[in-house]
Amino acid sequence: AEMAAAAQVSVCPAPLQALGLISGMFYTNRFDQIGLSLPKYLYGTDYKQSDFAPYVNPTYQKLVQALPPCLLVTSKNDNLHHYTTKFEKALTKYNMPHRLLDFPKNKQLTHAFSVFEPFLPESTQTIQAIAEYFAKIHEQ
């Protein structure tokens, strides 16, 4: 509720049981290609002065601890691989249930490969892993 109030949105009435995060663009506040273009578009021009500002940092403890179990997917050829692995470290630090599916270096496995190339064997493996993870969480 605190995060929703800071973002000036309503709390989602359907409780989230799990998240599948594929090649996440978690760090929108970095001084890089994503951080230079997205923050003002996503959060507005004065977001740094808002109550929502801390939540822009995906390693912010209150944000991380508010998340349901997460399945993270990346590959060594994903240009945002470092974002996913850093976020995974935050989930570990705060003892949040999660799983990391990190594929080895392969030129076909670029950013969001399982979405853009759904017929690759690794894409099938990703979708299967997400389905199994969600089913496991749902059974608990």
Model regions and ranges:
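Alpha/beta-hydrolase superfamily serine-hydrolase fold, recognizing
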Residues: 1-140
